[in-house]
A protein has these predicted regions:
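Active-site-proximal beta-strand elements of phosphoester/diester hydrolases
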Residues: 1-12, 125-133, 153
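Active-site metal-binding loops of divalent metal-dependent hydrolases
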Residues: 8, 40, 133-134, 157-158, ...
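Short beta->alpha transition motifs characteristic of CBS
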Residues: 43, 84, 95-101, 212-219
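C-terminal beta-strand edge segments of enzyme domains
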Residues: 118-120, 186-248
């Protein structure tokens, strides 16, 4: 399957909307079947955009490329930082970010989501996470053990100076759960305080990186994953007791 992960630089809102149309259709013309945009890619943290206008744009773009599944991650809607999944002019899944990033004041802007989300597309079960969620292995674990996901998609707004942490966490979630992980990060922002973003990263179920020349275009064979070393579902042992032994 051909996948496109945007390397998006957030600029003026109107220009962002124009570029969204252009990039989405250009990716479709190259044969991409699955296209991901990063967190807050249309507005950044400080600007706003009418949610209905955003939905209209997403409907227009996904109608113009009906063979593509779009993960638009994310927009500000209903007091949530929301990842939206669109196809053929319709939204059929969304996920509200659970683990808000307090150092950026996200808890003052949005309310946390109340559920983890996975959806089925073709023969895949796909779990959604958003940026800071990747720090919490329990979420990825639930998407693997309970939802039986094959793939995690993680839009993000990580800074370049912490790219090593971002990539390490993505790799860990892939290896420990034996699933594919796609991390699509903002490349930069020039409209607010100038910001350099981290990279895009893809890891296979063995935790091995999938490299490309541009960090945008990937060819992944979901039907032939690497052999499992440990089955994280069948071999999981649930323990509900933690012993604390005193040294006295």
């Amino acid at each position: 399957m051909k996948i496109h992960l945007s390397r998006w630089v957030c600029v003026d809102v109107e220009l962002n909307l124009k570029r969204l149309r252009e990039e989405a259709l250009a990716a479709a013309k190259t044969g991409a079947e699955f296209v991901v945009f990063p967190e807050l890619f249309l507005t950044g943290y400080t600007r706003s955009l009418d949610p209905q206008r955003v939905r209209d744009i997403f409907a227009e773009v996904s109608s113009a490329a009906p063979e593509v599944l779009f993960v638009f991650g994310s927009i500000s809607e209903a007091r949530h930082n929301r990842v939206a999944v669109w196809s053929k002019g319709h939204q059929f899944a969304f996920y509200d970010k659970v683990h808000l990033f307090h150092p950026n004041g996200e808890h003052e802007i949005w309310d946390p989501g109340q559920s983890y989300v996975a959806f089925e597309w073709r023969d895949l079960r796909i779990g959604l996470m958003n940026c800071n969620d990747i720090r919490f292995p329990e979420q990825a674990r639930a998407l693997k053990l309970e939802a039986r996901c094959d793939l995690l998609v993680v839009p993000a707004w990580w800074p370049w100076r912490r790219d090593h942490i971002w990539s390490t966490l993505l790799q860990a979630r892939a290896a420990e759960n034996q699933l594919w992980v796609l991390g699509c990060c903002i490349a930069g922002s020039v409209e607010e305080i100038e910001f350099a973003g981290a990279g895009n990263h893809v890891f296979d179920p063995a935790g091995e990186p999938v490299r490309t020349a541009d960090d945008r275009s990937y060819e992944l064979d979901f039907n032939n994953p690497p052999p499992s070393i440990v089955d994280p579902v069948e071999q999981f042992v649930e323990i509900d007791c933690v012993e604390i032994i005193s040294g006295d």
